[in-house]
Amino acid sequence: MSDYDDRIADLERRVAALEGKAAVPDPVAAGIVGYQGEVEFGGPLSWQIRFGAAGTLQLPDGPRVDVLAALGHPVRAAIVRHLIANGAQPAPALSEAAGLRSTGQLYHHLKSLVAAKVVEQDSRGSYQVPPTAVIPLLVMLTAASDVAGQLR
């Protein structure tokens, strides 16, 4: 075999190794975490998810920290609770519900919520919690209340 053939064979082995299935640890060895819900806010919604506990710890922190930070202010939490309970709302209604005196304050908080995909603006300019986020957000609020000792 020539040097050229040796190099081709070596490259083929490397490609095969890269394309082969890597050893994947058992995703449930550390256990499973899950949540579910069925609610009637703005129509019937149902959601269920189960995910490996170890996998949860391996997900990148950036996106989840953005969501937690967006909810980490009392005004933003009030906006989210109001939107879940009442559906899509125009900015003036949100400002009133959150007890804000200026639209500048409201838009400051909405910017954080929209950037984290917790809230979206619909085609009419109103704001809403995306239907796919309603139950996960309710679970987060419930879990935070549990950690804070409010449910016991």
Question: Predicted segment positions?
Answer:
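Short acidic, hydrophobic short linear motifs in intrinsically disordered regions
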Residues: 79, 88-97
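Alpha-helix boundary/capping and short turn/kink residues
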Residues: 73, 88, 100-103
